[in-house]
Design a protein with these regions (language model features):
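An active-site-proximal structural segment forming one wall of the substrate-binding cleft
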Residues: 32-39, 44, 51, 55-58
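A short secondary-structure junction motif
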Residues: 6, 55-58, 62, 99, ...
Length: 311
């Protein structure tokens, strides 16, 4: 909040390899959005408005240049939509086009921008996100294509995922490759967002498949323990280096937080975001029980009639 009324963004944003790194800010935007939906704190709107005005001022050649932010620009795009739906500021649509223009191209039919499992699970939805603004059906089809493409080759992992220990690699396509915990929760988030964008029950079913078959095997119920990689029928959980069978070098079967930071940051988002999408509004002022878990919800339907759902 202290940065919202000044031009200190340039000083506060990390530099990575001499370039501005916006990825960390994308994560914080989602945190602020959740906080605003809980609190209605106007400071969130003011901060995001000022921040996005600054983003619009950054030249294209300096915008979304780092690997992570370039892959994951779709997360930034969703935040721009979120703010536009609350303010209607027209400059946000210009920024949305700029973000898509400078984000990695996830519309490629076969050669993906990269084969990092978390990026694929997280970023395949970017074209569909842009479709919401443009109405270009090719964008929507591109997201379906990436989802299906990765599973045609590497989809030998039960529980909705695909084989990619860090990266999906030709020659390493059997279930033993497993998948990262990061990939699980980002796939769930993408499924939830794709469900909201399309209304296609495929995404609800797929999210449930990951949530109840893969995710519980990757973390302890109290989140005090987690795996970097979870494989079907995994019988070993040691701290040895299993490279090159596993892409990364190090103790990646039993997660060691002191040797790698991976999966420690987003592993807990799975259930909160899942819970947020259990009950959804429908275009006819109704409500849909879109995904299933024990829950209670009080919602308004029709002409504003309040009802309670208990599942």
């Amino acid at each position: 909040y202290s940065s919202a009324a000044s031009d200190v963004y340039k000083r506060q944003i990390n530099e990575r390899n001499g370039k501005r790194e916006l990825w960390a800010q994308m994560i914080m935007l989602w945190c602020l959005q959740s906080y605003y939906e809980y609190s209605n704190d106007q400071r969130v709107i003011d901060l995001m408005t000022n921040y996005f005005k600054w983003q619009l001022s950054v030249p294209d050649e300096q915008f979304l240049e780092d690997y992570w932010e370039n892959s994951r620009g779709g997360d930034n795009l969703l935040s721009v939509y979120w703010l536009y739906n609350r303010t209607g500021d027209q400059f946000l649509l210009e920024l949305a086009e700029k973000i898509h223009r400078n984000t990695a191209d996830w519309t490629r039919p076969s050669a993906l921008p990269n084969w990092h499992n978390v990026n694929i699970a997280q970023c395949f939805r970017e074209p569909a996100t842009y479709y919401m603004m443009t109405g270009d059906s090719a964008m929507l089809k591109a997201s379906y294509n990436v989802h299906n493409l990765i599973r045609r080759t590497f989809g030998q992992v039960p529980g909705g995922m695909f084989g990619a220990d860090e990266n999906a690699r030709m020659g390493s396509i059997d279930p033993r490759q497993g998948v990262e915990t990061c990939g699980l929760v980002e796939q769930m988030a993408s499924d939830e967002l794709m469900l909201c964008m399309t209304g296609d029950p495929l995404w609800a079913e797929h999210c449930e498949e990951v949530a109840f078959n893969s995710y519980p095997a990757a973390v302890m119920p109290d989140f005090k323990g987690l795996r970097y990689i979870t494989c079907p029928n995994q019988t070993v959980s040691d701290s040895k280096n299993h490279h090159p069978g596993i892409d990364n070098r190090g103790p990646f079967l039993a997660m060691n937080p002191f040797s790698s930071r991976c999966c420690q940051h987003n592993h807990a988002q799975g259930w909160p975001y899942y819970a947020e999408h259990l009950i959804l509004a429908t275009p006819d002022n109704g409500v849909a029980a879109a995904m299933y878990a024990a829950c209670k919800a009080t919602v308004k339907v029709g002409d504003g009639n309040e009802i309670s759902l208990h599942e």
